[in-house]
Amino acid sequence: MVEGLTVSLGRLGKGQKAEVVGLDEQGVVSTLQAGELERRLIEMGLVEGAHLEVLHEGFPGRDPIAVRVDDHTVALRRAEAAAVLVRLPKAAV
């Protein structure tokens, strides 16, 4: 993926790092009521400016994923991770 690009957390693979730039539930398939997914993601620490790294992908289907968010680890489904918009880091000069 292109560094500096904004993508959904659900598209990242194991070992990739990024920074949260926002949340967007539009088009996300979830069993939760409107607003509930966003509330849960915020409770997990997935807020603007948080730094994260994908630590683990489930087998089969790469679902769920384990993500280090700042100083703690959370697990979530890729479908829900699609609501988290992240920016990939730029290469160090």
PLM ranges: what are they?
Residues 1-47, 53-59, 63-93:
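Compact, charge-rich alpha-helical regulatory domains located at protein termini
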